Amino acid sequence: MLLSQNAFIFRSLNLVLMVYISLVFGISYDSPDYTDESCTFKISLRNFRSILSWELKNHSIVPTHYTLLYTIMSKPEDLKVVKNCANTTRSFCDLTDEWRSTHEAYVTVLEGFSGNTTLFSCSHNFWLAIDMSFEPPEFEIVGFTNHINVMVKFPSIVEEELQFDLSLVIEEQSEGIVKKHKPEIKGNMSGNFTYIIDKLIPNTNYCVSVYLEHSDEQAVIKSPLKCTLLPPGQESESAESAKIGGIITVFLIALVLTSTIVTLKWIGYICLRNSLPKVLNFHNFLAWPFPNLPPLEAMDMVEVIYINRKKKVWDYNYDDESDSDTEAAPRTSGGGYTMHGLTVRPLGQASATSTESQLIDPESEEEPDLPEVDVELPTMPKDSPQQLELLSGPCERRKSPLQDPFPEEDYSSTEGSGGRITFNVDLNSVFLRVLDDEDSDDLEAPLMLSSHLEEMVDPEDPDNVQSNHLLASGEGTQPTFPSPSSEGLWSEDAPSDQSDTSESDVDLGDGYIMR
């Protein structure tokens, strides 16, 4: 809907002109006193027709007919009687054919008569662009399944100046929800106009209202609501049947898949009951992408204390008669062996040595760093029980072998208490050599076999004399004759395996020789 291009321009011009004419020229006709207004006028555009309506303030006055007169303020003319509104009984008058210009100011006079007597006369000035209100047009609605057709009725011929700057608004209401539709109208508002409101819900009640909205945001007059209930969709039955068919199809497909899986499992193609290794166990496969964090390890503070201890070299000289404080250091051969000089003692002295090692306080082993104290050990008497038992026959020794005075855990120990040491010697790994004169001179205590060594004499066979000096070889043990230039040397690192092959050794009952 288009507004006349000159409407806004002439609006202010006509207002100024109207004031000027009223002040200078006045009104050229005689009229009664209108100081006491008794009428209320209203100009409106009803279905694009300019309709002037009035109402009397004093309801006690009841005229029988009315006569309407008007003049244009910009023209010095007398009042003219509106032909279709002379001696009318209606309280309104159609001025569409009389008031064609919207930019003019009109002066109207209304006279009320009762017979030939004038009851009242009132006047009012109108500016159509300002004083005119816009009533909604007539319309009809037709409801369908999901849309509504709105048909707006306009007059066949509408003056362009009466269209002003108007827009058509169609308002849709449903369940408290209001939607506005502003259709675009091309050209003049003439004839019937149809608008379709679509995307509606079937079987739902909708109400429609139509009105005209001015650009000046004047108060609008809405038409009464016209409601319609949309019929239910005709495709509802087919849609329900389609849903039922889809449900049945899905059920049949699920039944076929289930029966196929059960058959394959019964035949043995799937779900075999073979125990798989733990690596192929996929029961917790879903938990693999999110593994649990390993438990935290317990941490304790440890203080490391380094203690440097010097390795002691013990004197393996078992000669009790030597009281010298000097010690003979072990000698190392070129082959990597450690040589220790051993002095073979009589049986009585060997037994005494074993007894003395047992009498030593065990606390001396636990505190090797303490200074050593020379302890004078008692000597074993000649006729000790160990001697008597060793002097018995071979058969008696086999029946009651001597008990090892040292526990098994001491065999691997290289340190003894009181500056003495007890170790086992493997005769297969013992190397014997005769010391030269230079070697004998270097040693502080010569390891030569004494000619005064006691000999073991069997009372039954006095001719059988065994010497206490034994030499070990790789094949076994054999007695040797005492010689001033010969010494017996053994290695201290290897255990003994064949010490029980010779009867001349001191048999302890477990295959080792006590030295």
UniProtKB/Swiss-Prot annotation:
Q: Where is the signal peptide?
A: 1-26
Keyword Membrane present in the record's keywords: the answer is yes
Q: Name one GO biological process term.
A: cellular response to virus
Keyword Transmembrane helix carried by entry: yes
Name the domain of life this protein comes from.
Eukaryota
Q: In which tissues is it expressed?
A: Isoform 3 is detected in the urine (at protein level). Expressed in blood cells. Expressed in lymphoblastoid and fibrosarcoma cell lines.
TM spans, by residue?
Answer: 244-264
Task: Spell out the Pfam families in the cross-references.
Answer: Interfer-bind, Tissue_fac
Taken from the UniProt record, the cysteine pairs bridged by disulfide bonds within this chain are C39-C122, C85-C93, C207-C227
Q: What is the effect of changing E37Q?
A: No effect on activation of STAT1 upon IFNA2 or IFNG binding
What Gene3D superfamilies does the database record attribute to this sequence?
Immunoglobulins
Carbohydrate-modified residues are: N58, N87, N116, N188, N192
Q: Membrane side Extracellular: which residues?
A: 27-243
Post-translational modification as stated in the protein's UniProt record: Phosphorylated on tyrosine residues upon interferon binding. Phosphorylation at Tyr-337 or Tyr-512 are sufficient to mediate interferon dependent activation of STAT1, STAT2 and STAT3 leading to antiproliferative effects on many different cell types. Glycosylated.
Q: Where is this region: Disordered?
A: 318-418, 455-515
Q: What is the effect of changing E138V?
A: No effect on activation of STAT1 upon IFNA2 or IFNG binding
**Where Phosphotyrosine occurs along the chain?**
Y337, Y512
Q: Where is this region: Mediates interaction with STAT2 (and required for the recruitment of USP18)?
A: 418-444
Q: Where is the composition biased (Acidic residues)?
A: 362-375
PTM annotation (Phosphoserine): residues: S400, S467
Into which family does the record put it?
A: Belongs to the type II cytokine receptor family.
Associated disorder = Immunodeficiency 45: An autosomal recessive disorder characterized by increased susceptibility to viral infection due to impaired antiviral immunity, resulting in infection-associated encephalopathy. Affected individuals are at risk for developing fatal encephalitis after routine measles/mumps/rubella (MMR) vaccination.
Role this protein plays:
Together with IFNAR1, forms the heterodimeric receptor for type I interferons (including interferons alpha, beta, epsilon, omega and kappa). Type I interferon binding activates the JAK-STAT signaling cascade, resulting in transcriptional activation or repression of interferon-regulated genes that encode the effectors of the interferon response. Mechanistically, type I interferon-binding brings the IFNAR1 and IFNAR2 subunits into close proximity with one another, driving their associated Janus kinases (JAKs) (TYK2 bound to IFNAR1 and JAK1 bound to IFNAR2) to cross-phosphorylate one another.
User: Assembly and partners?
Assistant: Heterodimer with IFNAR1; forming the receptor for type I interferon. Interacts with JAK1. Interacts with the transcriptional factors STAT1 and STAT2. Interacts with USP18; indirectly via STAT2, it negatively regulates the assembly of the ternary interferon-IFNAR1-IFNAR2 complex and therefore type I interferon signaling.
Q: What is this protein called?
A: Interferon alpha/beta receptor 2
| Protein source organism | Homo sapiens
